[in-house]
């Protein structure tokens, strides 16, 4: 998934033409094969890995993911429903972040560098650098 996504992301910025069409085709193919919706408009840093082919992952168009991150299956990085409407913001994930299986990170929030997000955690507030966050809603259990 990672290599194909990078090609689609690069081509998605072309205005019209064959490459833009191929970008959408690759995005659709990844959705069908891996049951994921990782937007080619999202910004994903180098050496970031979607484990298990990113099965079930959803990444918002405006999400930013740093370098050297590990994202496991069924992770959602999306906008938050607030006061009867979507807030439109998407998470910004720092460098060297591990996001456990099934974690949900919602809204215009920042997850710092060197953070571990536990499996099935629901993150709706900022998480500082060098922290471990777990639970629903996520709570910081360790600061480095």
List PLM regions with ranges.
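Terminal amphipathic alpha-helical/low-complexity segments used for targeting or macromolecular assembly
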Residues: 1-35, 138
């Amino acid at each position: 998934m990672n290599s194909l996504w990078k090609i689609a992301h690069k081509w998605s910025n072309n205005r019209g033409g064959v490459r833009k069409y191929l970008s959408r085709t690759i995005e659709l193919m990844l959705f069908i094969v891996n049951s994921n919706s990782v937007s080619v408009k999202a910004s994903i840093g180098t050496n970031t890995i979607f484990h298990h082919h990113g099965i079930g992952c959803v990444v918002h168009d405006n999400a930013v993911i740093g370098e050297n991150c590990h994202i496991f299956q069924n992770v959602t990085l999306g906008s938050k429903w607030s006061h009867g409407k979507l807030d439109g913001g998407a998470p910004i994930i720092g460098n060297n972040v591990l996001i456990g299986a099934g974690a949900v990170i919602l809204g215009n929030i920042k997850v710092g560098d060197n953070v571990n997000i536990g499996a099935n955690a629901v993150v709706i507030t900022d998480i500082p650098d060098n922290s471990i966050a777990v639970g629903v809603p996520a709570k910081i259990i360790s600061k480095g």
